[in-house]
Every structure is written in structure tokens, then in C-alpha cells.
Amino acid sequence: MHTSPHQAGFVTIIGKPNVGKSTLMNRLVGERLSIITPKAQTTRHSICGIVSDTDFQIIFTDTPGILKPAYELQESMMHMLQHALVDTDVLLWLVDIKEKEVPPIVEKVLAQGRIPVLLLINKIDLIAGQEALESLVEYWKQKVNVAQIIPIAALQGFQIEQLLKHILVYLPAHPPFYPKDMLTDRPERFFVAEIIREQILYKYQQEIPYAVEVVIEEFKEEASLIRISAMIYVEKKSQKGILIGKQGESLKQVGIAARQALEKFLEKQVFLQQHVKVLPGWRSQNKLLQRFGYES
């Protein structure tokens, strides 16, 4: 009996900040791997999520939002995005219902014609009626030459199963790259730091969330609990004061929320210690960015 060959490949998700890339990634993988907050530029690293079945394996990469870099950290984020495109087999280009322009990086990919591009129109639940949706799809058909245009609603999970089927059309025949039970190539410490950073993004406004880097200095698993010590770096003394808050109350609230999220993620009781340290101008220093795991 003839059986289809096993398929495996790399799929990169790109789009502007806050378009829903991390929500889509989490829907596709079925696990909460990417930080999701209402703030733009939430994703700083390329995060890999793996979906495996009997006859296929898809390695998804959620990338930082497309932006014009304002400092070294953002330069590094854009390097990561471009690096993710090098080995990708399929590109998922996510737009929302208000977008009308094609980012230069997407124009470049389309001009090369090497990678099939699936244009995903997200947040279609916010469109008033079928006619408006059809008009939007037609607009993009006239504007770009892509492999497919697929309307989705990532938050609600609409069209996600169908999207997986569309991706498999373009995925090459290949043995699995990772063990079938593996969900990501990132270590637990990475996600612990991201979960703490997520709570900071939720709680603080303006510049504070973007000046923060979280480093896990201790991750010790004991019989009944996991001991975690996190160092939170900021750029200015004033930011440290705001982060800690009056009598340490603000940081305490971050710690409570982070511990609850960590216990859910790690499925074990967590003892969390947090410290704050000033590291002047870390976002603009290549050596420090490399130390924190960003590409130069």
C-alpha cells in the first residue's frame, strides 16, 4: 500500500506590531508559548513552536513585529526577523483589516519568488458583513501576488484548522527535525523570564516595559516546589523606583501575578524572588544585548 511521505518544514509568521502574530502562534501550537499583551513590540525574540502529527511536523517561528529600528535592541529584533526568513519553507504574512500597504521586507520576499507567501487577514470578526470582507480580499488580490489569501480570526480560533491544511500543501517531504513530543526549542528558563516580563508589560505604562530585561539567575527544582530568582534590569534609576513602587508594593504585585502564571505554566508550586538592577543604556549596547541573547 502506498503511503504519503512524511512532511516537515519551517513556517515563519511576520507582520506589524500588535497584528496578532503571537495569538496566532499560540493557536497553531496549542500552547501559550508567546507573550500576548495589548502593547506593541511585545515579542523581542524569535520563538519556535512545533506542531507534530503522525505524518507531518511544522516548526513555526513567531517573530518581532516589523518596525523601523530606533535603537540597538530594535536593530537586533529586525536582524532576528530577517534571519528567520533564510531557511523558511512557507511565510505567513499577517495583516489586520485596516492595513493597506506592503512592508518592504514582504515586497522583497515576493520579488524573489522563492518562498510561498500566505496572506492572512486577521481580526475579520471586526468586519461589518460578508460584502465588506469580500471587498477586502479583492483589494489584496489586486495588490499582491501571493500563494493564497486566507481570512482568519486568531483570537477566536476561526479558520486555524483550515490554515494548517493550507500550510501542508507547501510543506516539503522530509523526516521530522525534532522529537514528536517536543513543543519548542527554547529552554524553560526562557519562558519563565518571558512570563515575568509579560506581567511587567501588563502593569506599567510608557517607557518602563520597554526598558526592562529579565534574567533568570536561579532555577532550582525541589521535591515540592521550584525556586526561581529573577534579576530585572532597567536603564535608569528613576525606572527602578517606578518599578519597585512605594514600599515595594508595585514589584510585589508583579511577583504575585508572575508566580500564579508560572505555577500554571510549570504545573508546580513556585517560590519567586525578584531583584531590580540599573544597567545604563543596555538597549543600545551590543555586548549587553549579546549577553541577553539578542543577535547583533
Swiss-Prot record:
Residues 196-280 form the KH type-2 domain. Transmembrane segments: none annotated. It is a peripheral membrane protein. Keywords: Cell inner membrane, Cell membrane, Cytoplasm, GTP-binding, Membrane, Nucleotide-binding, Ribosome biogenesis, RNA-binding, rRNA-binding. An essential GTPase that binds both GDP and GTP, with rapid nucleotide exchange. Plays a role in 16S rRNA processing and 30S ribosomal subunit biogenesis and possibly also in cell cycle regulation and energy metabolism. This is GTPase Era. Residues 41-45 are annotated as: G2. Monomer. GO terms for molecular function: GTP binding; GTPase activity; ribosomal small subunit binding; small ribosomal subunit rRNA binding. Residues 152-154 are annotated as: G5. InterPro entries: G_ERA_dom (IPR030388), GTP-bd (IPR006073), GTPase_Era-like (IPR005662), KH_dom-like_a/b (IPR015946), KH_dom_type_2 (IPR004044), KH_sf_prok-type (IPR009019), P-loop_NTPase (IPR027417), Small_GTP-bd (IPR005225). PROSITE patterns: G_ERA, KH_TYPE_2. GTP binds at residues 15-22, 62-66, 122-125.
